[in-house]
Amino acid sequence: MLCKRTLSEISSLYTASKKKKTVIDTLSYTYPDVLLSCNERYQITHPELGIVHASNLYCSSLESFCLQYRDYGNDLSIRSCEKLVFSDALITGLSRIKFTPWPECRTRYETTVSELRRLHDMDNFTEASGFLEDLKRWLCSQNVFLEPFQKNCILHVICFLVATRTPHHYHYIFEYIKRLFNIENINTSVLDTFKHKTTVFLVPRRHGKTWILTPIITFLIKNFSNISVGYVAHQKHVSQHVMKEVEILCRREIPYVVENKDNVISVIRTNSRSCALFASCFNTNSIRGQSFNILLVDESNFIKKEALHAIIGFLAQSTAKIIFISSCNTSTQSTSFLAHVKKTPTQILNVISYVCEEHLYSFGERSEAITCPCYRLHKPTFISLNLNIKKTANAFLKDSFNEEILGTTNTSFLANPILTDSSVNEFDMIRYSTVNKQLQEHLADTLFVYVDPAFTTNRRASGTGVAGVGRYNNQFIVYGIEHFYLKSLADTSEDSIGECVAFMISGIIKIHPFFTMVRVLIEGNSSQAASVKIAYCIKAHLSDSACILQFYQTLDQNGFEQPFFLLKKNKRAAVEHFVSKFNSNLIKASQEIISHTIKLNFDPIEYLLLQIKNISQIVTTESVEYTTRKTKDSSDDALVAVIMAIYFCNDQEVALYKCI
């Protein structure tokens, strides 16, 4: 019998499921009856392609496509709403090819397909896929997104179980897991760390360390047969709370018999039993004599030393993995021992922090700093950090903000530049060929040009910086750089600067005919009248261009719009924006970069890098400021132009650009 409320809920859920329609598509296993005209020694049997040439094994894009759309026999086989369609060009090309039937190899192909399906029906594969499928469904029902370290923890669990329970098929199942987690391009040596027998996570407070363990434990004992999972907490009430949460979720999700007895939750099947044991460090011998496949140690930094010896003993078991999860190091040595594993030959330490190691020094020397200056690290939306929180935390306990909230370690680091070495090397080495016709189809058709004029002949002071920047999806491409010095302070100074800018724009448009719009910002802080004259000079030199030429307009003292831009407090935000994009490898240079003023024997990008490396921090009592300091070898004019061009390279203030 069902009560009226339960009956109505079941009815509504059933109706909703009937209405739900998901567009799905997977590759067919129907035998492609097509003759392959090549020597038999070069033939391979591919489950999706049939009998094909062996060279297809070395096409990574083809392999990735087949793995993505392969029919694995479960709900994770496809990505939702991805319908396969043939382009008109492909259909036309295929219609011109004549195919000859080849029924002789049907048996050979069907044998390969049956072997693949047998692999998908194998218990270990269905256990791993079932675990991931249940976890995905549960996360969707919670309407939450996983933190990166939580995904990392799940990968450590599932990859180790696959490696120990299915060593012969580990590679294939691992490729399946990589596709689900969208980590196909990660280095293999990095992925091998998931197979290590132990790993350590040091995570800041309030990041869901214990929360993610509940579904992991539940769906492990639900999907994997004869598995034993251990959970050890630093306090008994924590262990009991997690056990209750796991029991509730098990009784809701698992159709088998669920038994909770003596701090052990068991899932009883017809021919197997899976269990999860929950213990605290106050009972130091509670986990001795057990045989765990996965042992989760929560708040490991605060585990009693006597209990830790019993935990470490499981390292000798070949099929056991120990995962230490804890808050980050505090000021006392007794609760920071996990940082010692950084010295181990294997990479088992994972430190999750708001501050990267390259800039940790600034949080000890500069008390006002609260965020990492490279802007690369992820911070959840439910975490709030500001200077008031830092002062309040440190008022309660000295250095508590760094040690308890930020997730920093006690290790001291030397000062390093704000921009990382990897981002500098990538900007220098990886440059796009923007004259490539295939790439030009994806490049934005608007060129943003920033002009920072300087009216001086002193080369040690400053010159005019000019930069041309465009978009490529979420990336920025530098098309041109100029660093122009006046020969004399004559009446034609504005004409000389305007001519330099026009020549750069003309050169960019000449080799990049896809540009249809040029938007120019001329800084008018030095002289508004001179900026207006520069704008009209640029217009005169580009009068024959087919591109639409627009200038950033600002109201003057009389209320008239004039083609100049007044730089106020934008510079600090622009530098922060540049540092963030640069360290995220989102700023690239064109191989065909235009520059008429930088010496021919000097690479314009290397010239720019000399200035980029001079970006530094200035910390005041109120905030953290950035500056591009000048040196005797290089001025910062070209860099300022690039920074401002990238900052304004968007469509947010389109109405302020007008033709003159």
Curated annotation (Swiss-Prot):
The active site is at 299 (for atpase activity), 452 (for nuclease activity), 523 (for nuclease activity), 637 (for nuclease activity). Gene3D superfamilies: 3.30.420.320, P-loop containing nucleotide triphosphate hydrolases. It is found in: Host nucleus. One of its GO terms (cellular component) is host cell nucleus. GO terms for molecular function: DNA binding; hydrolase activity. Its main location: host cell. The keyword DNA-binding applies. GO terms for biological process: chromosome organization. Its EC number is 3.1.-.-. A motif (Walker B motif) lies at residues 294-299. InterPro entries: DNA_pack_C (IPR003498), DNA_pack_C_sf (IPR038435), DNA_pack_N (IPR003499), HSV_TRM3 (IPR033663), P-loop_NTPase (IPR027417). It is an enzyme of class 3 (hydrolase). Keywords: DNA-binding, Host nucleus, Hydrolase, Viral genome packaging, Viral release from host cell. Interacts with the terminase subunits TRM1 and TRM2. Interacts with portal protein. Belongs to the herpesviridae TRM3 protein family. HAMAP family: HSV_TRM3. Component of the molecular motor that translocates viral genomic DNA in empty capsid during DNA packaging. Forms a tripartite terminase complex together with TRM1 and TRM2 in the host cytoplasm. Once the complex reaches the host nucleus, it interacts with the capsid portal vertex. This portal forms a ring in which genomic DNA is translocated into the capsid. TRM3 carries an RNase H-like nuclease activity that plays an important role for the cleavage of concatemeric viral DNA into unit length genomes. This is Tripartite terminase subunit 3. It comes from Elephantid herpesvirus 1 (isolate Asian elephant/Berlin/Kiba/1998) (EIHV-1). The lineage of its organism: Viruses, Duplodnaviria, Heunggongvirae, Peploviricota, Herviviricetes. The gene is TRM3.
